[in-house]
Amino acid sequence: MFGQINHFLFLLFSFFFPLSVALGNLLIIIISVLWLFSGKLKEKFHLIKANKFAMACIYFFVLHIISLLWTEDFYKGLERTKKMLEFGIYIPILLSFIKIKNIEKYLTMFLISIGIMVLTSYLIFFELIAPTKGSTINDPTPFMSHITYTPMIAIGFYLSSRFLLSMDSISMKNNKAMTIFLVFISISSFINVFMTEGRAGYVILFILLSLLFFQAFGTNLKAIFLSIVSIAIVFFAAYLSSPTFKQKIQSTFDVTNNFSNIQNSSIGKRLIMADISIEIFKENFLFGTGVGDFEDDYKKIMLKKKLNNEIYTDIASSTKNPHSFYLLVAAELGFVGLLFLGYLFFAHFKLALTHKSMFKKDILISIGICFLALNFSDSYFLGHFSSFLYLFFVSLLLSERA
């Protein structure tokens, strides 16, 4: 009975987590509580222990807990550690109960949610409805900021396209409704990416587009040629037809060309954050400062720099996030933290590459590459929507339950 209830709840989670943080959190907590009280804990823990990726997630989470021993601000550290519950608790739990036979249903529910997001975005763009909180007509990203929205929509494009690649002509004829739905999601989400201001999403879309060609034609010159040509065509078509995309590309070139004023740009501020984060890492190379201490350590170094160099005058004195998860882990958990994070990705790709299903193998590799790239530009493993997105895919596709 509990299995059926959790199956239904995860169907709801698959649909609601891209639309609502509150509902996503509520559903995952209920699923976890039911899992705990549904019995057969010994069997469940055995399944978790046998899954190398689940254990890699737990190791990374436990390192956060251990680092509380040397952090100076215990309560801030506790708050940071809570943001890693997806890795320490939720992913292992989901890996122990999700059944392979239900995976397609969960993915379909996710794509329906993507369809609602895209449709809402178009309605905002064409001024048929008022912009939702945080979105504008020029940046129609409902339910979340463009930092997370655009990569998620790009992944929606990839998933629907990969579904279409796996369908032969007979299955398309037999299930016309599903085929039409997938084509709609693929085309509408592809266009929608260039209607937003999410530069990270642009990069992810181009990466996923290339991967689709390699997954369709194999690793050969044809796939390389088609991916390069298609990216070039899409780039210039988007540049000529999308004012938002054009503006973001031009602003990026303007910043790089006007290097003397780079510190006042978003790119310049990120470079300064990176510089200070590396200083913190060098001072605490092996184990880091401990989770939760980054903001205070950053502030100390920034105040010194402001006294010695006027270019830092207009830069914010503190930040909780250096806009790179790797820099944050390096500063807070040191070289050991980077090793644990590296092992997490290693386990992800190792299990992906040995997966028996080509469909799941392709998606796992693509999701892994996406999050490897995304975490350079921001701390995507800390955001509610983005961490749930990663949780969703790895829990489904790395589950070994029949």
Residue ranges and their predicted role:
Residues 1-79, 95-111, 163-180, 222-226, ...:
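Transmembrane signal-anchor hairpin modules in multi-pass inner-membrane enzymes, especially those
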Residues 30-36, 209, 341-344, 364-376, ...:
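Transmembrane alpha-helices of multi-pass inner-membrane enzymes
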Residues 168, 213-214, 223-225, 332-372:
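Hydrophobic transmembrane alpha-helices and their immediate junctions
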Residues 195-196, 216-261, 273, 278-283, ...:
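A membrane-periplasm/extracellular boundary helix in multi-pass inner-membrane enzymes
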Residues 261-275, 283, 287-333:
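Long extracytoplasmic/lumenal interhelical loops at the membrane interface
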